[in-house]
């Protein structure tokens, strides 16, 4: 007996048991039988074998349990019972993630092959989107220039358009990451030159948030209370040409820490909305529309929220399909801001959803089609897998699905899409 897969012999037994560990794709297979008494007489059958990865398409959740990050996966293909595969990074790579969970994302298939990125405070991991095997590791050994320490408070590498990203270290410095580079670019200068005035240097203390664009990034400085747009002048000698060596400081004073941002639509084009909140003073503000450089669009773009329900631990998300901004009150209650309301008469409308009393919202993620909102909650169950995820209707809050014990405390989620060879 002989079995072949793409012309490669894989077995010589009557019954075949074979694990495909290469690519999930369509293979050409052949089973061949040779009569023992006459080697010249052979029987064979050719057929196709379609191999799918168990991680082809579904929900990827990054959660945290007592500073132990973990990745869980739930397939949305032929999974009627919503079976959840937990700790899939450790399962496929035979080692555990370290640090504090920060973010998980998947790149665009056509420009970056659908690569999955997992970010923690200790390291960033580039994973094969089919096998979840680690392709690249970015840690303290992945810097172009010297780094004071590797302990990130924010990190995202991938943007579907720009393929550019970066991280903020505990040292308050930005470490850019360019697509397909196996390292971080040189860290941003601190203090840094002001655009148009090479003699002026300013210090900064960033909120743990970035809006990355091509060869630049938008940060928010808690010292000046303004957006700072980090760029490279190409005039100041550095370790590499991508080092951020100058900033453009926004003219608009906000004076509150940056909580988060999201894309919204206006006239068929994307713009950005940002939420600001200071838990010490309990003051909040909304930048309804601004550019990727931090410039506010329109005189009424900055609104200080008097009737807000933000609190320490609040999370937010923007639905670009209906231009709503969702945020939590630090507990189980959701609120919505209508970014398209011209008068903005109702800045905080309760968004009712029948979540249980014994939970705290820790994650909000709008679905790719903008029709649903994934709500990650931490329950009071005395166990490791205390994190649940609810899929709710994006307009009325109706619970569509409940994924119980998805992981630890939910931090970030991505709707993993299949790639061409899966």
Regions found by a protein language model. Give the residues of each.
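Preference for solvent-exposed, low-hydrophobicity sequence contexts
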Residues: 113-320, 324-325, 336-337, 341-347, ...
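Surface-exposed, flexible coil segments in extracellular/virion-facing regions
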Residues: 2-21
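An edge-strand/N-cap motif at the start of beta-rich repeat modules
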Residues: 48-78
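Repeat-based blade/solenoid architectures
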Residues: 96-101, 250-256, 306-312, 354-362, ...
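Short, exposed coil/turn segments at beta-strand boundaries within extracellular/luminal domains
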Residues: 36-44
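Loop/turn-rich, solvent-exposed surfaces of beta-rich toroidal or solenoidal domains
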Residues: 308-381
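Hydrophobic/tyrosine-rich beta-strand signature of extracellular beta-sandwich/beta-rich modules
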Residues: 29-33
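Blade-level signature of beta-propeller repeat domains, shared across WD40, Kelch, NHL, RCC1
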Residues: 375-422
């Amino acid at each position: 007996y002989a079995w072949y897969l793409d012309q490669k012999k894989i077995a010589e037994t009557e019954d075949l048991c074979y694990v495909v560990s290469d690519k999930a794709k369509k293979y050409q297979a052949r089973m061949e039988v040779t009569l023992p008494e006459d080697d010249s007489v052979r029987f064979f059958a050719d057929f196709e074998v379609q191999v799918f990865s168990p991680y082809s398409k579904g929900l990827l959740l990054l959660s945290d349990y007592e500073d132990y990050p973990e990745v869980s996966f739930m397939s949305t293909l032929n999974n009627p019972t919503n079976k959840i595969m937990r700790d899939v990074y450790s399962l496929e790579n035979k080692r555990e993630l370290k640090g504090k969970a920060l973010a998980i994302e998947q790149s665009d298939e056509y420009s970056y092959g659908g690569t999955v990125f997992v970010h923690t405070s200790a390291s960033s991991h580039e994973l094969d989107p089919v096998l979840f095997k680690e392709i690249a590791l970015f840690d303290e050994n992945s810097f172009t220039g010297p780094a004071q320490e590797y302990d990130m408070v924010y990190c995202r590498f991938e943007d579907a358009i720009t393929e550019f990203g970066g991280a903020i270290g505990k040292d308050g410095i930005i470490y850019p990451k360019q697509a397909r580079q196996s390292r971080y670019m040189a860290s941003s200068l601190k203090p840094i030159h002001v655009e148009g005035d090479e003699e002026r240097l300013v210090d900064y203390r960033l909120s743990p948030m970035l809006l990355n664009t091509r060869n630049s990034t938008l940060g928010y400085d808690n010292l000046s209370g303004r957006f700072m747009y980090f760029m490279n002048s190409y005039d100041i000698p550095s370790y590499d040409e991508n080092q951020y060596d100058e900033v453009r400081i926004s003219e608009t004073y906000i004076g509150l820490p940056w909580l988060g941002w999201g894309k919204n639509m206006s006239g068929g084009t994307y713009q950005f909305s940002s939420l600001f909140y200071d838990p010490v003073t309990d003051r909040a503000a909304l930048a309804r529309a601004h550019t990727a450089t931090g410039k506010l669009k329109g005189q009424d773009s900055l609104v200080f929220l008097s009737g807000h329900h933000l609190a320490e631990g609040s999370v937010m998300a923007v639905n670009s399909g209906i231009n709503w901004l969702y945020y939590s009150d630090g507990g189980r209650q959701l609120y919505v801001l209508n970014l398209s309301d011209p008068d903005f008469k109702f800045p905080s409308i309760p968004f009712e959803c029948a979540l249980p009393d014994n939970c705290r919202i820790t994650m909000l993620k709008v679905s790719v089609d903008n029709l649903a909102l994934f709500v990650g909650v931490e329950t009071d169950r005395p166990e490791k897998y205390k994190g649940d995820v609810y899929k709710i209707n994006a307009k009325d809050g109706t619970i569509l699905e409940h994924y119980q014990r998805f992981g630890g405390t939910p931090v970030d989620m991505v709707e993993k899409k299949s790639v061409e060879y899966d």
